[in-house]
Regions:
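Generic enzyme active-site microenvironment
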Residues: 14
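Active-site nucleophile/metal-coordination loop of metallo-enzymes that catalyze phosphate/sulfate
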Residues: 2-9, 17-117
Length: 118
């Protein structure tokens, strides 16, 4: 694939709990050659850190990445949420609870091909 064709594609890899400092260390030591190739051919922060949202727990962080919106906008702020029933909580990591549009839907609506694999 040509460099120009690659420039028109987005490939995002996210690994929950992957320490960017250790990843950078192992890449620099040659222990992660395939990750090094992806870094060299793409665009990323040098320190590999994700500029995220608060709180720094899984549901709001992944939803922020998926939507480009902060937790106050997309509504996913923790693992659980209150329900209408007293003393009942529900798992909150569910797209039906998200108030913002995922980026892949935005891209698809503008005629772009998208693929999401979880």
């Amino acid at each position: 694939m040509s460099r120009e064709a690659l420039a028109k594609k987005i490939f995002c890899i996210g690994v929950d709990g992957m320490d960017p400092r250790l990843t950078r260390k192992y890449v620099d030591e040659g222990k992660m050659p395939n990750v090094k190739k992806l870094i060299e051919r793409g665009a990323c922060r040098h320190d590999l850190a994700m500029v995220g949202a608060m709180p720094t727990v899984t549901p709001p962080m992944w939803t922020t990445l998926a939507t480009g919106a902060y937790p106050g906008t997309h509504g996913i702020t923790c693992f659980y949420r209150a329900t209408e029933e007293p003393d009942v909580i529900a798992y909150n990591f569910d797209s039906r609870n998200c108030k913002a549009e995922p980026l892949w839907n935005v891209f698809a609506e503008s005629g772009k091909k998208t693929l999401v694999w979880h």
